[in-house]
């Protein structure tokens, strides 16, 4: 099972990515589909959000329950909040993206001048 992890909270989710998102200035992006209200999503998914993808699986080990394994991938580089699409079935999709090269250069110039 795949989860979105924000701080210590995990949300079941489907997550896909694009190296070049032509619908969003050509930036790399991740689309996160989960069960949440639009108001909750707008509050949670903001610029600068640190988040990760968690995969949990139960691996057979000869016992009745098996052993749970967990892998986690940091996605803090995808920190630009994008559009929220309400599917009107209790789920929504949120886009989180990386800065474009131009945005990154402008950020660095701004930091150097500060």
Per-region residue spans from a language model:
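Intrinsically disordered, low-complexity boundary segments flanking structured domains
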Residues: 1, 18-22, 37-42, 79-81
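Viral virion structural and adsorption modules
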Residues: 2-6, 55-114
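Generic recognition of long tandem-repeat/solenoid scaffolds
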Residues: 20-37, 86-97
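Extended Gly/Ser/Thr-rich low-complexity repeat segments
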Residues: 36-60
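Residues that cap or initiate secondary-structure elements
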Residues: 10, 38-40, 100
């Amino acid at each position: 099972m795949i989860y979105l992890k924000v701080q210590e909270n995990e949300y079941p989710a489907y997550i896909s990515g694009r190296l070049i998102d032509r619908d969003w200035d050509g930036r790399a992006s991740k689309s996160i589909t989960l069960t949440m209200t639009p108001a909750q999503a707008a509050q949670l998914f903001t610029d600068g959000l640190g988040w990760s993808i968690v995969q949990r699986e139960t691996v057979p080990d000869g016992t009745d329950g098996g052993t749970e394994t967990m892998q986690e991938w940091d996605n803090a580089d995808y920190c630009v909040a994008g559009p929220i699409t309400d599917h009107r079935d209790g789920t929504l999709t949120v886009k989180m993206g990386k800065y474009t090269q131009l945005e990154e250069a402008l950020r660095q110039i701004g930091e150097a001048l500060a």
